[in-house]
């Protein structure tokens, strides 16, 4: 396999707002890339906190029996995360990537505390609104920043490593909360790790992660991308309707996340109703994101060689 360093793009011309020439490529930016992988692992761990326990908290602590009400936390999370994803890209180009990443972590800080202290189900729903902001801003921003760093040649690998870190962390966090819940109850013990995840994610993002918008500008200059850019509405129409390939990719993502939501919201309740212990529920809920994450290492790298279309079709 060709070493990462041999795949680096040429040094870009210095930009007015950067102190030194910018290099694109995984080898040239390995330290920052690794930090972003770690940050996204914390992002995944935050959402993994809820995979095993929160649907059960609805019934055990608040006496909710309606599946519609139980799933309201997931609906609030999904809507807010979708909106955060929608605007994250445009805002990242306007104000920079790092400010969005930090803002996402600030939104995530109260989440475990709200769940721990919640006197009513409404607190859980509000915690998931904040978690949706956290996930939408932080996950999207880490994706954008990794793509900025590696340049055009290895974007599949960059995405694969991002998703690997995120979903393996989801899995391990779900497994951990299952064991903590079995040993110490549904609250508060399973959510204590979330405080550490949020604080560490914020600290690394503030003090170690660097802005990558200059890398995107450098790549644009190298490629001579002087054509006028589409506005927000034009990009939205292109990706969601006008371009058939992008439309197909968008609907595939929709279906994929609908499946994920079903697994997250219903499987813990289904298993608990049949007498499955909390630690075993944790194993089941951890298996799905673990396989998802491990597969990303292969599919991300292979998509750079073989293309994306048939991998998406095979997965569907």
PLM regions and their residue ranges:
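Helix-to-loop junctions at the C-terminal end of transmembrane segments
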Residues: 84-96, 181, 295-307
């Amino acid at each position: 396999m060709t070493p990462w360093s041999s795949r680096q793009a040429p040094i870009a011309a210095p930009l007015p707002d950067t102190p030194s020439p910018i290099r694109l490529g995984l080898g040239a930016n390995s330290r920052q890339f690794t930090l972003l992988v770690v940050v996204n692992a914390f992002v995944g761990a935050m959402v993994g906190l809820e995979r095993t326990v929160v649907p059960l908290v609805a019934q055990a602590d608040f006496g909710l029996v309606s599946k519609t009400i139980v799933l309201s936390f997931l609906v609030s999370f999904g809507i807010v995360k979708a909106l955060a994803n929608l605007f994250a890209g445009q805002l990242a180009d306007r104000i920079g990537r790092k400010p969005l990443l930090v803002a996402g972590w600030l939104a995530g800080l109260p989440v475990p505390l709200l769940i721990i202290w919640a006197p009513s189900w409404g607190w859980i729903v509000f915690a998931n609104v904040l978690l949706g902001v956290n996930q939408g801003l932080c996950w999207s921003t880490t994706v954008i920043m990794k793509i900025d760093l590696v340049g055009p040649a290895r974007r599949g690998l960059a995405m694969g490593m991002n998703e690997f870190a995120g979903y393996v962390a989801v899995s391990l966090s779900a497994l951990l909360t299952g064991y903590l819940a079995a040993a110490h109850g549904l609250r508060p013990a399973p959510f204590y790790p979330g405080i550490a995840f949020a604080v560490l994610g914020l600290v690394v993002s503030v003090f170690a992660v660097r802005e990558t918008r200059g890398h995107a500008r450098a790549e644009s200059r190298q490629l001579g991308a002087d054509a006028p850019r589409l506005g927000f509405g034009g990009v939205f129409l292109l990706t969601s309707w006008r371009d058939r390939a992008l439309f197909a990719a968008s609907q595939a993502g929709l279906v994929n996340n609908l499946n994920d939501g079903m697994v997250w919201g219903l499987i813990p309740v289904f298993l608990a109703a049949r007498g499955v212990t909390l630690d075993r529920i944790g194993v089941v809920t951890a298996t799905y994101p673990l396989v998802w994450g491990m597969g990303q290492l292969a599919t991300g790298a292979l998509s750079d060689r073989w293309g994306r279309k048939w991998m998406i079709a095979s997965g569907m």
